[in-house]
Amino acid sequence: MSQTVGATRLAYSRVWHHISAVTPHPTLSTIKAPSEAITPPSLGRLASRIATILMGKHKPIWDPSTDCGDYVVVTNCAGLYTTGHKKWRKTYYRHNTRPGSLQAITMDALMEKHGGAEVLRKAVSGMLPKNRLRDKRLARLKAFEGDAHPYKENLVRFGGKVVGAPGWEEAVKAIREADMERL
């Protein structure tokens, strides 16, 4: 039995998670009415889940003073889902501390100028703790406008299939059945 307590290499290894911003998620999505289909996760729910993964709060070894979070690859940010009129009424402000330099931009203008990835990055940044680890955690967020991204080989795989990809549930069932037969 290992007597090592604290920062073991295996415990702090980083995993790559994939999240699609337009695919309905069983826990992050909401149902508007019983007759309607499940909506994609809203911007806030998606950002809070991403912030949790970036901080490492989903791990049993989580500690606020250590950086044990994982990488997150978010695709299809161009189709971010927002509720209500936020897309046209939400305003982002910036100021460079000089008189008269306050600038404002709405969410739809920001999405046209920089894309949905920047909107998601700002939302996640607001949900991370404001400390020295914030920039390091945000650097592990990789957001893309479409499906294509260069991190396909790094994503978490279970039974040879990328977790969350079509058909990965069947791979999990096959592995579980094989384990039950073996036991």
UniProtKB/Swiss-Prot annotation:
The entry's keywords:
Mitochondrion, Ribonucleoprotein, Ribosomal protein
Q: What is its main location?
A: mitochondrion
State any GO CC term.
ribosome
Which molecular function terms from Gene Ontology are attached? Answer: mRNA binding; structural constituent of ribosome
Tell me where it resides.
Mitochondrion
Q: Which Pfam families match?
A: Ribosomal_L13
UniProt keyword Oxidoreductase present: no
**GO biological process terms, semicolon-separated:** negative regulation of translation; translation
Q: Which InterPro entries match?
A: Ribosomal_uL13, Ribosomal_uL13_bac-type, Ribosomal_uL13_sf
Is Magnesium given among the entry's keywords? no
So what family is this one in? Answer: Belongs to the universal ribosomal protein uL13 family.
Assembly and partners?
A: Component of the mitochondrial large ribosomal subunit (mt-LSU). Mature N.crassa 74S mitochondrial ribosomes consist of a small (37S) and a large (54S) subunit. The 37S small subunit contains a 16S ribosomal RNA (16S mt-rRNA) and 32 different proteins. The 54S large subunit contains a 23S rRNA (23S mt-rRNA) and 42 different proteins.
PANTHER family under this entry? LARGE RIBOSOMAL SUBUNIT PROTEIN UL13M, RIBOSOMAL PROTEIN L13
Matching NCBIfam families: rplM_bact
Q: Report the function annotation for this chain.
A: Component of the mitochondrial ribosome (mitoribosome), a dedicated translation machinery responsible for the synthesis of mitochondrial genome-encoded proteins, including at least some of the essential transmembrane subunits of the mitochondrial respiratory chain. The mitoribosomes are attached to the mitochondrial inner membrane and translation products are cotranslationally integrated into the membrane.
Please report the name of this protein according to its UniProt entry. Large ribosomal subunit protein uL13m
Q: Which organism is it from?
A: Neurospora crassa (strain ATCC 24698 / 74-OR23-1A / CBS 708.71 / DSM 1257 / FGSC 987)
Underlying gene: mrpl23
